[in-house]
UniProtKB/Swiss-Prot annotation:
Listed PROSITE patterns: ODV (PS51316)
Domain named Olduvai: residues: 165-259, 436-528, 529-600, 601-692, 695-750, 751-843, 844-919, 920-1012, 1013-1111
Organism of provenance: Homo sapiens (Human)
Protein family (similarity comment): Belongs to the NBPF family.
Protein name listed in UniProt: NBPF family member NBPF9
Miscellaneous field: Encoded by one of the numerous copies of NBPF genes clustered in the p36, p12 and q21 region of the chromosome 1.
InterPro entries xref list: NBPF, Olduvai_dom
Localization per record: Cytoplasm
One Pfam family this sequence matches: Olduvai
Predominant cellular place of this UniProt entry's protein: cytoplasm
Region (Disordered): 161-198, 451-474, 510-569, 829-871, 999-1033
Superkingdom of source: Eukaryota
Regions of compositional bias (Acidic residues) in chain numbering: 165-181, 530-539, 550-562
GO CC entries: cytoplasm
């Protein structure tokens, strides 16, 4: 059986769908929420996993301790900051409490002052009415007594107004005594009743002031009437009354915030802004409880804020750390979250900083306000104390008038005087209680009172007598003192008319007024003494500075530093002339001057300045004014070791022995031996004025009659027209510290001394390192030998930057590969010895030398050029080799001329690496065969020398000398050095001696004249003797051997060829030139016998000089 169901109807289907939808909607919303939460959790989990993986990957475990430590420090820092903020809040609260209490106290004191001022003015008016009665009859008798009683009542009321509450018992006792006195007097009963009724009205004015000085701030058990303030001068305290329930520490903090300053401000300078009244203990407790109640919720709120802040700070720190890590690994998906968290952290920090600044500013304002109120309170308390003292003295004075001991004295003129005194006391009281803005009114009232007192009928004698016999009233006269001292310029009565007595029972001996009054009184008591002293000093005339200082030290009392330095110790018109030099007058050390002026000597110079010329003290600029027309020129070291008067002085004038010409800072490293200079100067006084060494006055010397000396001497000295350098320096300085400039040589000083001793008996010694040659006048000296002529630098030389003596750096070979150190002390000794031989005839000495030269070789003074000075007028022309052995006058001399026997020519240390090209030499010799006269090797000067009658010398001698036509190097050097130290420069050549002899024989046939005759003559002379060759000496040229024959051919060719490119120095023959046996050269020349036969007569040289240099 088949069952068939029909379809649902459309309505039923719709109903079912709607119901299903309604059921599923909340499930769908719930599922969506769950999905969102799950997605967020998944994201956070992914983030945490990513950070964990990164930390694990980069071994982040090592940084855990560091992270914890940093977070712990951060938390501790936050806690400290929060504690500091709480402390500031508590301090601010205490300041607020203090400010409120001070405001109330100020208000009460102001009110009391106002009431006291009104009462004192009414009392003053009452007494004025008594002093000037309209009806004379009423001023006598009973009416006067009543009026005086009324004045006493007013005075008592004033005392009550101005008295604090702790004096209430004393005031009541005083009032009882006054009542008894009034009852005893004849005053009617009605007056007493009226007075009592008026006294009872002062209830509010007699209320107590809150703060007590006698007990602690928390003691509140005593009744209200016993809690009073005592305004004492020494102890003024602004104690805050705090609740007993509040902690004692807080009370002490409130008390110790600010110390109360003493009474320093003016009593009349009262300007008040805030006013406050005193609080009783109950009121104080109420206020404190209210404040505590208000502050408790604030404190709880602050604590909660602190906890929230701490938690937020920790979270922010952690988020910042995570953000930094994510940023480091470029986690892009978390950028928004990172920015948000960092922005919150920065905003939080800015808010906290702004809050702290606000609290600090508020606290500062409260502090300023508290200080101002403290000062104002101190002034008001001082004013109240003074007014209270004045009112008591006035009250006692009126009581004395009311109860006279002798009735006769209370009548008449005496009564008028006492009433005038009472009026004066009342006026003084009004002044004490008045603020500054009432000063003008008080002055007008005072003027009126003074006029009334003058109009009274009291005779002058009684007033004077009364001034002497005023009864000793302790407190009133203490107040009287300050009435006259309160403005000595404002009061009409003189200060001296008041008799002052002091009692020490209750009040201090002097009333402390304003600081301005105290300072003015100090000025009054201190300044007149000084003024009188100044007047006496002005009458005596101007005092010297020393006396003035002594008088000031003896007479002027020691004041405060402020007054001591606020006035000039010397009158203004005396400052410029009487200030000593020890003051800041010569404060030139602030202007680059480091000198100490001899003050005593300068003062003595100032005293004598009127009668004689002012002597310039050392280190003074007055050196510019000195005149020295007759002073002879001293040696240069003396001349330049002292500052000249015409020098353009610098900013610092320094003593003589200083580095005035700081030449060691300007290319010079010399230390001047001043003691040696002084010794040298003393020696020069007995001699002729010597040439100032290294002086610029060499330019001014004239030698009109000097004949032409030997060219050597003429040219061996620097000309007067030389362009001298910038520096003149003494001998014994460190100028020639040549050991610092490439020096490696120490001269044999013993040999030098020995040579110097030998020179003393011979010709004139050559002053080494000296320029005094310019001063020696030798009018009859004939022309010297040619070698001497050419061995000296010409006057046309281009001199270098420094003109210096011979052995010095003048020929700065030391700066150009020179290594020798001069014995300067020995040079000075030689220089002094030369002065005794200055201008004597040198012919005798030369003749003696010539006689001695026959048996010995003439000594060569090393490092000297004075050989040029020897006169040999009759010397004949020397042999041609001697002619050529000297450098020609036409040589282009270098910048340096140097002595003969130095180690200048240690060319093995120079740049010699020469290998002679023998083939080139042979080729050059063959080319010469077709030319004119044979060119002697090592010489080019044969082309320039004209020798019409000179006999031909031996050819080997001719060639053994360097030519004068050579292109000379930078230095002219002596013969006997290590010129040919070629074995040290790896020159390993062997000369073909046979070839050289062959070439030499071929050249002998081409001489200008017949050289055979000369050689034959020389050979005949050489058979009997061999002339000695003194090594390292240029004087070989002076040995006379006129008949020497021609030398051997090997001697001829033992000299280097003329085509050699000569190095920087000409050197002596007897050097290590022939040390070729060390370099496998197998020829030994017989040098001692046949090489140096270079002696000729003097006549030959004279003839040669006349030919070459005709005059």
């Amino acid at each position: 059986m088949v069952v068939s169901a029909g379809p649902w109807s459309s309505e039923k289907a719709e109903m079912n769908i709607l119901e299903i939808n309604e059921k599923l909607r909340p499930q769908l919303a719930e599922n969506k929420q769950q999905f969102g939460n799950l997605k967020e959790r998944c994201f956070l989990t992914q983030l945490a996993g990513f950070l964990a993986n990164r930390q694990k990957k980069y071994k982040y475990e090592e940084c855990k301790d560091l992270i914890k430590f940093m977070l712990r420090n951060e938390r501790q820092f936050k806690e400290e900051k929060l504690a500091e903020q709480l402390k500031q809040a508590e301090e601010l609260r205490q300041y607020k409490v203090l400010v409120h209490s001070q405001e109330r106290e100020l208000t009460q004191l102001k009110e009391k002052l106002r009431e006291g001022r009104d009462a004192s003015r009414s009392l003053n008016e009452h007494l004025q009415a008594l002093l000037t009665p309209d009806e004379p009859d009423k001023s006598q008798g009973q009416d006067l007594q009543e009026q005086l009683a009324e004045g006493c009542r007013l005075a008592q009321h004033l005392v009550q107004k101005l008295s604090p509450e702790n004096d209430e018992d004393e005031d009541e006792d005083v009032q009882v005594e006054e009542d008894e006195k009034v009852l005893e007097s004849s005053a009617p009963r009605e007056v007493q009743k009226a007075e009592e009724s008026k006294v009872a009205e002062d209830s509010l004015e007699e209320c107590a002031i809150t703060c007590s000085n006698s007990h602690g701030p928390c003691d509140s058990n005593q009744p209200h009437k016993n809690i009073k303030i005592t305004f004492e001068e020494d102890e003024v305290n602004s104690t805050l009354v705090v609740d007993r329930e509040s902690s004692h520490d807080e009370c002490q903090d409130a008390l110790n915030i600010l110390p109360v300053p003493g009474p320093t401000s003016s009593a009349t300078n009262v300007s008040m802004v805030v006013s406050a009244g005193p609080l009783s203990s109950e009121k104080a407790e109420m206020n404190i409880l209210e404040i505590n109640e208000k502050l408790r919720p604030q404190l709880a709120e602050k604590k909660q804020q602190f906890r929230n802040l701490k938690e937020k700070c920790f979270l922010t720190q952690l988020a910042g750390f995570l953000a930094n890590q994510q940023n480091k690994y470029k986690y892009e998906e978390c950028k928004d979250l990172i920015k948000f968290m960092l922005r919150n952290e920065r905003q939080f920090k800015e808010e906290k900083l702004a809050e702290q600044l606000k609290q600090a500013e508020e606290l500062r304002q409260y502090k300023v306000l508290v200080h101002a109120q403290e000062r104002e309170l101190t002034q008001l308390r001082e004013k109240l104390r003074e007014g209270r003292d004045a009112s008591r003295s006035l009250n006692e004075h009126l009581q004395a008038l009311l109860t006279p001991d002798e009735p006769d004295k209370s009548q008449g003129q005496d009564l008028q005087e006492q009433l005038a005194e009472g009026c004066r006391l009342a006026q003084h009281l009004v002044q004490k209680l008045s603020p500054e803005n009432d000063n003008d009114d008080d002055e007008d009232v005072q003027i009126e009172v003074a006029e009334k007192v003058q109009k009274s009928s009291a005779p002058r004698e009684m007033q004077k007598a009364e001034e002497k016999e005023v009864p000793e009233d302790s407190l009133e006269e203490c107040a009287i003192t300050y009435s006259n001292s309160h403005g000595p310029y404002d009061s009409n009565q003189p200060h001296r008319k008041t008799k002052i007595t002091f009692e020490e029972d209750k009040v201090d001996s002097t009333l402390i007024g304003s600081s301005s009054h105290v300072e003015r009184e100090d000025a009054v008591h201190i300044i007149p003494e000084n003024e009188s002293d100044d007047e006496e000093e002005e009458e005596k005339g101007p005092v010297s500075p020393r006396n003035l200082q002594e008088s000031e030290e003896e007479e002027v009392p020691q004041e405060s530093w402020d007054e001591g330095y606020s006035t000039p110790s010397i009158p203004p018109e005396m400052l410029a002339s009487y200030k000593s030099y020890s003051s800041t007058f010569h404060s030139l050390e602030e202007q680059q001057v480091c000198m100490a002026v001899d003050i005593g000597r300068h003062r003595w110079d100032q005293v004598k300045k009127e009668d004689q010329e002012a002597t310039g003290p050392r280190l003074s600029r007055e050196l510019l004014d000195e005149k020295g027309p007759e002073v002879l020129q001293d040696s240069l070291d003396r001349c330049y070791s002292t500052p000249s008067g015409c020098l353009e002085l610098t900013d610092s004038c320094q003593p003589y022995r200083s580095a005035f010409y700081v030449l060691e800072q300007q290319r010079v490293g010399l230390a001047v031996d001043m003691d040696e200079i002084e010794k040298y100067q003393e020696v020069e006084e007995d001699q002729d004025p010597s040439c100032p060494r290294l002086s610029r006055e060499l330019l001014d010397e004239k030698e009109p009659e000097v004949l032409q000396d030997s060219l050597g001497r003429w040219y061996s000295t620097p000309s007067g027209y030389l362009e001298l350098p910038d520096l003149g320096q003494p001998y014994s300085s460190a100028v020639y510290s040549l050991e610092e400039q490439y020096l490696g040589l120490a001269l044999d000083l013993d040999r030098i001394k020995k040579d110097q001793e030998e020179e003393e008996d011979q010709g004139p010694p050559c002053p080494r390192l000296s320029r005094e040659l310019l001063e020696v006048v030798e009018p009859e000296v004939l022309q010297d030998s040619l070698d001497r002529c050419y061995s000296t630098p010409s006057s046309c030389l281009e001199q270098p930057d420094s003109c210096q003596p011979y052995g010095s750096s003048f020929y700065a070979l030391e700066e150009k590969h020179v290594g020798f150190s001069l014995d300067v002390g020995e040079i000075e000794k030689k220089g002094k010895g030369k002065k005794r031989r200055g201008r004597r005839s040198k012919k005798k000495r030369r003749r003696g030398r010539k006689e001695g030269e026959e048996n010995q070789n003439p000594p060569c003074p090393r490092l000297s050029r004075e050989l040029l000075d020897e006169k040999e007028p009759e010397v004949l022309q020397d042999s041609l080799d001697r002619c050529y052995s000297t450098p020609s006058g036409y040589l282009e001399l270098p910048d340096l001329g140097q002595p003969y026997s130095s180690a200048v020519y240690s060319l093995e240390e120079q740049y010699l690496g020469l290998a002679l090209d023998v083939d080139r030499i042979k080729k050059d010799q063959e080319e010469e065969e077709d030319q004119g006269p044979p060119c002697p090797r090592l010489s080019r000067e044969l082309l320039e020398v004209v020798e019409p009658e000179v006999l031909q010398d031996s050819l080997d001698r001719c060639y053994s000398t360097p030519s004068s036509c050579l292109e000379q190097p930078d230095s002219c050097q002596p013969y006997g050095s290590s010129f040919y130290a070629l074995e040290e420069k790896h020159v390993g050549f062997s000369l073909d001696v046979g070839e050289i002899e062959k070439k030499g024989k071929g050249k002998k046939r081409r001489g200008r004249r017949s050289k055979k005759e000369r050689r034959r003559g020389r050979k005949e002379g050489e058979e009997d003797q061999n002339p000695p060759c003194p090594r390292l000496n240029g004087v070989l040229m002076e040995v006379e051997e006129p008949e020497v024959l021609q030398d051997s051919l090997d001697g001829c060719y033992s000299t280097p060829s003329m085509y050699f490119e000569l190095p920087d120095s000409f050197q002596h023959y007897r050097s290590v030139f022939y040390s070729f046996e060390e370099q496998h050269i197998s020829f030994a020349l017989y040098v001692d016998n046949r090489f140096f036969t270079l002696t000729v007569t003097s006549l030959h040289l004279v003839f040669q000089m006349e030919v070459i240099f005709p005059q």
